[in-house]
Amino acid sequence: MTTLSPYDNLSPVAQTAYRARAAAADIAPLPRAAKDDALLAIADALEVRTSEIVEANAEDVERAREAGTSEGIIDRLTLTPERIRAIAADVRDVAALPDPVGEVVRGSTLPNGIDLRQVRVPLGVVGIIYEARPNVTVDAAALCLKSGNAVLLRGSSSAYASNTALVRVLRDAVGGSGLPADAVQLVPGESRDSVRELMRARGLVDVLIPRGGASLIRTVVEESTVPVIETGTGNCHVYVDAQTDLAMAVDILINSKAQRPSVCNAAETLLVHKDVADAFLPLALDALADAGVTVHGDEHVLARAEGSKATVVPATTEDWETEYLSYDIAAAVVDSLDAAVAHIRLWSSGHTEAIVTTSQAAARRFTQLVDSTTVAVNASTRFTDGGQFGFGAEIGISTQKLHARGPMGLPELTSTKYIVTGDGHTR
């Protein structure tokens, strides 16, 4: 006699989601030690099985080269033994972080004698949709496990072999440590149909977190029936005020743009107050040229570029809304601080904006008027990062206002519930 599974009549994606939901219920109440043991087992397994992972990754890299994929994307796709060791070290760092589950957010004894506590609890089943970055597979799994969640991973089809190998290693380590292996699963299928089904799995999946470019994020936000935490694109701005330290402004600009241009907290637009443009722009353009950055300038920047060694091209409307993720930056001269704020309000993705100024009044007004997750005063945009903020590892930078905003660490992968304890109290 054949015993039917309750999942037999479901699609592969739905089966995966149901198994994740069951696993989430099992791991939610586990003590920190059990979760940390699983994470340490994952780190060890990644190092022991490095050759298996690298071999699978080589398949993806070969296919990417045959398809004419850019070297930048291939670099993000590539896993080396050194990178795998770094990923394993990151997992151990997550294990060392405090467990947010069970933390009392607030509590008190009410006038009627009832004890009331608001405590952190896991979100449940977290779906991650991401592009060709196989390191995200491990990072997301580690953060979700530490916060007591099950995770459904849907990476780019271009990294399918890598992600399959990584999830196999993760599941073996998790199961071997005594936790349910189904707490970590790869969403089956390489087609967009599986992504659409995941986005419509409301009731099975508690939240979706997209990580990638603007097109991916927009698709998930617009088409998903599952609640989404939007890890937005990073169209970040640096505004150089009329009252400024020129050398500091150049240093902050170059660090914000050129230190690592392919990340979401890199600056994409430079705004310069007209009163300091003649003094600042020649310095800035030469420094940007030395860093290999192409400037997409408005007419005021172009007029001041004569004699500069910088590559300056005319800016178009599209430049103001572009997250380049490359050695390119848009630049404009503005009439006032308020004009800079107006430009930011119109074009920013709400990630990070910086002002460089010696005026406390200007800094105060800028921080009050700019509505982004992070507003930096005399500091690089590159500081918007969970590790830099002292929060530990992050799953992304949320640019929305509900549930989480800014770097999303372990606490942001939890919700809360209220514990009401009485002594026969009735109302």
Curated annotation (Swiss-Prot):
Compartments, as annotated in UniProt: Cytoplasm
Keywords attached to this entry: Amino-acid biosynthesis, Cytoplasm, NADP, Oxidoreductase, Proline biosynthesis
GO BP term, pick one: L-proline biosynthetic process
Organism superkingdom: Bacteria
Sample GO molecular function, one term: NADP binding
Known EC number: 1.2.1.41
InterPro entries the UniProt entry points to: Ald_DH/histidinol_DH (IPR016161), Ald_DH_C (IPR016163), Ald_DH_N (IPR016162), Aldehyde_DH_dom (IPR015590), G-glutamylP_reductase_CS (IPR020593), Glu-5-SA_DH (IPR012134), GPR_dom (IPR000965)
PROSITE patterns noted in UniProt: PROA
Gene3D superfamilies linked: Aldehyde Dehydrogenase, Chain A, domain 1, Aldehyde Dehydrogenase, Chain A, domain 2
Function: Catalyzes the NADPH-dependent reduction of L-glutamate 5-phosphate into L-glutamate 5-semialdehyde and phosphate. The product spontaneously undergoes cyclization to form 1-pyrroline-5-carboxylate.
PANTHER family linked to this entry: DELTA-1-PYRROLINE-5-CARBOXYLATE SYNTHASE, GLUTAMATE SEMIALDEHYDE DEHYDROGENASE
Family: Belongs to the gamma-glutamyl phosphate reductase family.
Protein name: Gamma-glutamyl phosphate reductase
Organism: Streptomyces griseus subsp. griseus (strain JCM 4626 / CBS 651.72 / NBRC 13350 / KCC S-0626 / ISP 5235)
Gene that this polypeptide is encoded by: proA
